[in-house]
C-alpha cells in the first residue's frame, strides 16, 4: 500500500478491477451481465457492451498508434484483461443516453449521486473528476464532471457540463492528440466564442525526421519550428516526452536522452521531464546521471512516489 487510505489521491485501474470483482462476488452475476441488466438494457444502449474480440460488431472502429515512421495498427489486447477498468465499447449516442439518465433517478438515487459527484481529494469524486471551468475559458464558472481514458489504439474524453445538461464526448482511434484542448474548442462553440485554431502535433513530423535524418536533425527541426511557427504546433512538454519514450522502447537510448534533455531545457520547472530523463539514463546504465535527475524531479515534485522509489533502488545498488 502506497499510503493510508483517504490521505492521498492516486488513480489506479486496479481499483476498478477490484470493484468489478466485488460486484460479481456480491451478486453472483458476471460483470457483463450486470452491465446489461442494470444500465445498457434499461437505457436502451443497444450499441454498448463488454467487448469480445471474436464478436462481429458492425462499424467497429480499429485502433492505431503513432510510431516514429508513421501510423501502425495498435497491438492486440485480450479485452478480458482490463476487465472492469476498460473493456467496454460504446457510441456517442449511447453515452448521451447514459449522461441524460444521470440527471434522473433511473440509475442512481439522489443520495448516491451526491456522493458520486462530490470532489474529495484533488477534485476526484467516486469515479469522476469534478472541477469548475476557469475564468479565462469558455463556460467559465460552470461545473464540469469528466473522465478520460486510454487503451491500445484508443483514447477518450467525456465532459458533462451539468449547468446546461450539455455533453462533450471525444473518441480517438490514434492516441496522442490533446483531447482536453479539443474539448475546450467545443466548449467555445457551445458558448458562442471563437475557438482557438487547432495545433499540429509534433510527433509525426519530428518522428519522420528522426527516422530519415537522425536525432540532431530532429532537435534542429524542433528549434526551427518553434522559432518560425510558435502557434502552429503543440509545443507542450508531453509531445517531446512521447517522442522520447518511443525511442526508449526501441532501444535508442542515446537518442531518447537527447530528446529528454531538450525537454528539460524547454521545461526546467517540470518534475516530470527530469523523471523521464532519469529513466533514460537508468536504462542506459548511467547510474549517477539517473540519480541526479531523479533527485531534481523530486525537488520539483515531492509527491512523485515513483521517482522516490526508483531513486531509492538506485542508491541501494
Predicted ranges, named:
Residues 1-152:
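Short, surface-exposed loop or secondary-structure junction motifs
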Residues 133-137, 141-142, 174-240:
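Short, gly/Ser/Thr-rich active-site loops of penicillin-recognizing serine hydrolases
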Residues 237, 271-272, 305-306:
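Helix-start (N-cap) detector for alpha-helical repeat units in TPR-like alpha-solenoids
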